[in-house]
């Protein structure tokens, strides 16, 4: 049995109901039809909360949206007073196989935690993510857990465990010698957090990952070559361009980890679809990205979390990394580059994914724009906008109700009271 699938089986048993329990039940079916009646509807597209709108769901899809809908005899009415109904939120940058670094360091997670333990945690984290109203995630690398994300995705899709829809990157790709863990005796072969490849071998590695189930290819365009060093570029433009061509030919998008201006420039010119982090991005780099249609996933929450783990309490004076990140985010906003929402969740707790949304608004992005980015915007960037990210007829019924009005008070996204995925209600907080 494949090592990753074996670990997934062990993990599912560990978090299941135990020896002698009843056989697993089939995945729940959506209700025949339901009319959802919130106070208002944020459809993900126009940035407004439409008061008095209702949403009719039939099976797994949305049938109608508007103010004058009534329930026929065969339609269940779901009353959600005091709430705003939104599309299921999308986190475009998670690592379900990581957990917060103030619990266990990244090195120790990669080197010391057994795969079955990491998979069991990932199962729990997937459920927490869904319960928080995030019905889709893009998982950008298992960080040493191989292809276990493919198995977790299958378990969710088959209804074995609850969780969001997943787009997975499996192992991700790094230049030889550039990634971690680092700082060990060179005589020891240390497991790596991603797959190493260079030159023509890089395309072969990308194709292998796609063949094993990757929905997206992730490259590290820059990283710290030595422990404690600043990030520097890794791959050449030509290396990354070859991967982009291979991935796009296979119908996959490419995400690039890049924090330095040069790493971001190379990745953009290579044709990647999104750049993750962009910590030191400049006005010139963001203009280049906009011209090439490259999106930025700023991952504000990860940087915020790391500084808090180091002792910062959120007050002034801010650490230098936060000051620099604020400046780059302001430049990105001013440039008009497409922004996706993804917190690098896993650096901080799964289930608190909305932390990124709240920070983006707190750092100057209009709440309505952040909400659109977290729904229809993310769906478009990830290539799933034909079926997810908006409340409109024909779309999949991935829906979340939050207490209050998130356009007026962005913190409302943290007050999730009702969640449906594909027309199946998976969370309902008593009113």
Region spans (language model):
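His/Asp/Glu-enriched, well-ordered alpha-helical/loop segment
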Residues: 108-110, 249, 321-406
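Histidine/acidic residue-rich metal-binding segments in metalloenzymes
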Residues: 200-296, 320-338
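Bacterial N-terminal signal peptides
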Residues: 7-18
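Histidine-rich, glycine-flanked metal-binding segment
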Residues: 27-32, 41, 46-86
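Active-site gating loops and adjacent loop-to-helix segments of metal-dependent hydrolytic enzymes
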Residues: 97-118, 176-191, 225-233, 290-323, ...
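Divalent metal-dependent hydrolysis catalytic cores, especially in the metallo-beta-lactamase
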Residues: 121-147, 163-171, 214-225, 253, ...
């Amino acid at each position: 049995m494949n090592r990753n699938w074996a670990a997934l089986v062990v993990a599912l048993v560990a978090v299941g109901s135990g020896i002698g329990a009843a056989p697993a039940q089939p995945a729940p079916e959506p209700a025949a039809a339901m009319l959802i009646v919130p106070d208002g509807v944020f459809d993900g597209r126009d940035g407004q909360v439409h008061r008095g709108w209702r949403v009719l769901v039939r099976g797994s899809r949305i049938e109608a949206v508007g103010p004058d809908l009534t329930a026929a005899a065969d339609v269940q009415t779901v009353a959600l007073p005091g709430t705003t109904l939104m599309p299921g939120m999308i986190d475009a940058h998670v690592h379900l196989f990581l957990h917060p670094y103030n619990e266990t360091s990244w090195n120790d997670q990669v080197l010391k935690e057994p795969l079955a333990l990491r998979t069991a945690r990932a199962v729990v984290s997937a459920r927490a993510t869904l319960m928080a109203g995030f019905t889709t995630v893009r998982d950008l690398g298992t960080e040493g857990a191989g292809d276990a994300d493919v198995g977790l995705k299958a378990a969710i899709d088959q209804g074995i465990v609850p969780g969001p829809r997943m787009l997975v990157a499996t192992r991700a790709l790094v230049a030889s010698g550039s990634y971690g863990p680092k700082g060990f005796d060179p005589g020891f072969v240390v497991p790596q957090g991603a797959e190493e490849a260079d030159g023509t071998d890089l395309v072969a590695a990308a194709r292998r990952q796609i063949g094993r189930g990757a929905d997206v290819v992730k490259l590290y365009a820059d990283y710290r070559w030595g422990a404690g060093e600043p990030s520097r570029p890794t791959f050449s433009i030509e290396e990354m361009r070859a991967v982009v061509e291979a991935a796009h030919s296979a119908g996959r998008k490419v995400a690039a980890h890049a924090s330095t201006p040069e790493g971001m420039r190379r990745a953009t010119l290579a044709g990647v679809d999104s750049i993750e982090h962009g910590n030191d991005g400049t006005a010139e780099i963001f203009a280049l990205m906009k011209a090439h249609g490259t999106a930025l996933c700023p991952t504000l929450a990860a940087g915020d979390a790391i500084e808090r783990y180091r002792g910062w309490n959120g007050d002034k004076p801010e650490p230098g990394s936060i000051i620099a990140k604020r400046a780059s985010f302001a430049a990105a906003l001013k440039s008009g580059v497409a922004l996706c929402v993804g917190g690098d969740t896993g650096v901080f707790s799964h289930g608190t994914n909305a932390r990124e949304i709240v920070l983006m608004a707190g750092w100057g992005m209009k709440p309505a724009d952040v909400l659109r980015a977290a729904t229809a915007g993310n769906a478009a960037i990830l290539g799933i906008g034909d079926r997810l990210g908006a409340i409109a007829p024909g779309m999949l019924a991935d829906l979340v109700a939050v207490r209050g009005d998130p356009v007026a008070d962005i913190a409302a996204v943290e007050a999730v009271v009702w969640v449906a995925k594909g027309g199946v209600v998976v969370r309902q907080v008593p009113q």
